[in-house]
Swiss-Prot record:
Its EC number is 4.2.1.20. Keywords: Amino-acid biosynthesis, Aromatic amino acid biosynthesis, Lyase, Tryptophan biosynthesis. The alpha subunit is responsible for the aldol cleavage of indoleglycerol phosphate to indole and glyceraldehyde 3-phosphate. Signal peptide: none annotated. Pfam families: Trp_syntA. The gene is trpA. CDD domains: Tryptophan_synthase_alpha. This is Tryptophan synthase alpha chain.
Amino acid sequence: MKNLENLEKDLKNDLKKDLKKEKPILVSFLVSGDPNIEATLKFMNALDEYCGVIELGIPFSDPIADGSTIQEANVRSLSNGYKIHQSFDVLREFRKFSDTPVVLMTYYNPIYKRGIENFVIQAKEAGANGLIIVDLPLDEAEQYRAICKKHDMGTVFLVAPNTPDERLMYSDEASTLFLYVISTFGITGARGSFEKMTFEFIARAKNLCDKNKLYVGFGISNGEHAEKIIENGADGVIVGSAFVDIIKEYGDSNETIYKLKELARELSEGIHKGYVKYNEKNKY
């Protein structure tokens, strides 16, 4: 019987094969500077082997789209004196060892204060592949999109179950990395299960959006969730609060590293199972 180390190696090899074949992936989300910036780098390195994309949140004092778990992580980071340049610094360090795509997630205010083009240039130089600005409406993003295009910075826009078809296709066209599909109404945070509406929305988005991969986020916290989302046609799952909960409980410790990797492994296995089921249902 294979030991745990060999099982981990097999899973990592399978993940690399999945990425090459464009199979569904795991996108992990972390809040930069929680509990400290040095720990953020360690957590990114720990999750890197399981993730196709890492989403790094830039702390903000009023994160309106986030639930209590991520709001509290923002508070912890800002209370420790977090500054935006630290996210760029940690990304530069991460780039010394990894080429895994990293997307910075933030709100418009911090970018506006820094200057949109200045922020994009600094993010690009640090090694970011794309940006998600949660509260920037697509209709008001023309300047931002032009600047990102000028500096070859990817853009990701969000869509929700109540997004009209025309808006859905417009968001797909405006996104250049992937489309962030919100699973349900409300804010981020773990949930017990998903409603039929979620799967109907994934099907609608898959039918209408032909440019980008569809990565589904909000409420996914375990392997069973990941399996169900992928089984219903998503190209990836975005998981944040479940990872942040671990960091809150165990802080900057080896136990945190172990728990993060354990959850990432469970999610990856769920993604693989969901992909097998999806192919079985759609092979004819």
